[in-house]
Amino acid sequence: MGTAKIPALLWFLLAGLVLALAVNPAHGAKTRHYDFFITETNYTRLCHEKSILTVNGQFPGPTIYARKGDFIIVNVHNNGNKNITIHWHGVDQPRNPWSDGPEFITQCPIRPGGNFTYQVILFEEEGTLWWHAHSDFDRATVHGAIVIHPKRGTTFLFRKLDKEIPWWNDDVEHVLDKAKRIGGDVEPSDTNTINGQPGDMFPLCSRDDTFKVAVQQGNTYLLRVINAGLTNDMFFAIAGHRLTVVGIDARYTKPITVDYIMIAPGQTMDVLLKANRTLGSNSRYYMAARTFITLPVDTIRFNNSTATAIVEYTDSAVARPVGPPEFPVLLPAIKDEDAAMAFVKQLRSLGNQDHPVHVPKQVDEHMLIDIDINFLPCDANNATNKLCEGPQGNRFAASLNNVSFQNPAIDVLDAYYYGSGRGVYEENFPNKLTVIVNPTGDINGGGPLLTKRGTKVKVLEYGTVVEVVFQDLSIENHPMHLHGFTFYVVGRGSGTFDERRDPATYNLIDPPFQNTVSVPKSSWAAIRFRADNPGVWFMHCHFDRHVVWGMDTMFIVKDGKTPQAQMLPRPPNMPEC
């Protein structure tokens, strides 16, 4: 790859983000300032105009540019009509849970008319991350990218931004309210999108706005791919081209060249595209994003759309367009589980001198967390006094180790900080279920049919090495995201985890370093991390309907003995509940 070619190619996507480009990371200060204004904005997609929450009137929202180790100050002004919080997804926020963002976990929400200043501390992150709302389903439209360049004095060549995001043709707030009230499943979105557009396979009114990427033959581009979807894993491919993955979740990987990627909600990937079509080739190629799902498609509604954008060669070395763009024939089918697993098993940490691998070899705390879809009895939240819309008149729920998380009325971090956690949360989240459950492929995977609500947390001493094995008992994949930490994905397997046999298969040499791991249906995934970030840290499935149903818990990491191992003081401007 010729290094001289890269800089001339940076601007075809970045030029539209004028405010971000005005602060060039190569010359900017180490402290960067942004103002986010939450507002209601009218947008048209799929021939319908609707009012959505946006940041600075943009959908997707503004991109934050920084360098590794920078300090970012974001003042969020809530000019919308509802409470809101913002989470900086994948930023570890060392010693600073106060600015992590999940509502009622680390802060009370920002009320309409209020504002809150977030302090975002970048440490080891380098590559692509993103920010999003962390309240109800607001992240459907309130989200944007975080582009983290290397430290000053160092370089890397991969700099082109592309994002993959969802679009809802039904009112998001109505969808969520209905699901909460009557306990049924959440209505699926009408389409997937790439950079806010569904593509030209949808109604005529959408075609003129199809996202297009202009490329020149022989050059190499970096796609910063973000799955901001609420409920779907995605396959992504570009017709006539292979893709080289060089990073995931802002951590470098050993380069792998593939025909497609599979990316879970919440994940980010840095992917190289070589524009290698030659004279006589078509000059237009679809990049396509398609839902990957393991649910029974004949009985459960889901978004089965394929979003498209167009890669278009603009130089004379390639023929001008004749007919429609080519479609990626190697894009996997919706239920291709083998294709999904084949991709994720290839991921490895880079592991060089500048980016070493430090996998903990000795584990202090072993946890086996069963992930399941359950039910709760229909209750007074159903204002119609009719049966709920879940199976057998119940409401849908979800659980970790048969605990369906219930949000408290005040935020947990404040309660912990002031020593007033009694009555707010319980410090007894179980390390494992007492009954061994085998995945069955039924609707609730053979786990407990009915679950119980609770606000249970796991308390860890500072420096504890933790291994968590996620055991998926359900018929659906689950992207599990941990705030405050990046972890090593040391193992995967199908069926029931065997604590005597399966650890021997772990990769302790160069496992991928991630903040979100996709746990396949009826399978398991093992992660390891060192609890060296004091504070309260949320862990949850990144399917938003599962968060609402209770597939969440928290780690409370105690302060260490030195000042550098203790939480930062509480900021004076924290929102009040």
Curated annotation (Swiss-Prot):
CDD domains: CuRO_1_LCC_plant (cd13849), CuRO_2_LCC_plant (cd13875), CuRO_3_LCC_plant (cd13897). Binds 4 Cu cations per monomer. Residues 37-153, 163-316, 442-561 form the Plastocyanin-like domain. Its EC number is 1.10.3.2. It is an enzyme of class 1 (oxidoreductase). Glycans are attached at residues 42, 83, 115, 276, 304, 382, 402. Transmembrane segments: none annotated. One of its GO terms (cellular component) is apoplast. Its cofactor is Cu cation. Cu cation 1 binds at residues 87, 481. Lignin degradation and detoxification of lignin-derived products. Belongs to the multicopper oxidase family. This is Putative laccase-1.
